[in-house]
Amino acid sequence: VKDKLLRIAEEVYSAYRELPKDYDGHVKVGMGASGSPTSKIDRFAEEAVLELLDNENIKLSVLSEEAGFVDRGYKDVLVLDPIDGTLNCVRGIPFFSVSMAIGQKSMLDCEHALVRNLANGDIYYARRGGGAEMNGHRIAVSKYTRDESIFSLFMGPDAHPDTNKVRMHTSRVRSLGCASLEMCLVARGDAQAQYMNCTNFNRMIRVVDIAASSLILREAGGEVVDLETKGKLDLEFTLQDRKNFLAYGDIRLKELILSDSA
């Protein structure tokens, strides 16, 4: 399974790097199945994956941000975000990825996950019960100390006011625009928390965004919790399910941050 995910990620990575410098990837070419506008670069990457699955007879159905659910007749589902961080991609900010997980019904039953940074080629992979790795080396979360920690926060006009309370628990904040890679930073111990508390339902997180990175973080020793239920975050394999969440490496952050969240 890992080899299949690596093959798919390599297809997207190679196809992206072969694009001409004047490629107009920002152009909107329609509406995706999720209800969000589809950029030309999103559709390009998704079509590269779907074509590969067909050409190499890879036995997976697909749930993708743009195409929605593609029933190819298989129980195992590839949960795909062909370009996570589209705006970063089209603006030349080197922090965007292809994100893939394999499961059957929801995020919590995913067995394999792979996130590849399409700007520098870094590969994050996890198998349920098998730990997490970056570029073939095991990774693990790190301990929280206020003065040394970095929190990745969802910011802007749709950010819940509680975000400002959470910000006070760290001396450094980032908002990087690619949920999958931000969570991988927590998994590898270079950030200590990721917090998304959004007042606009249409901008909350979906399963295609973080199915892969959630398994990677959990296998690295961290956790992702639902801000509403305070329990483990789970998302059904549908584009209609959206949630706010906290991802952390150190268990002490769960109580510390959730106490600030309405």
Where are these regions (language model features)?
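Short Gly/Pro-enriched turn/cap motifs at secondary-structure boundaries
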Residues: V29-G30, P37-T38, R91, R174-S175, ...
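An extended, acidic
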Residues: A9, R128-G129, A140-A262
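Residue-level signal for inorganic ion chemistry
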Residues: D42, L53, T86, N117, ...
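General beta-strand structural signal in soluble alpha/beta enzymes
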Residues: S61-E65, C89, R174-G177, D226
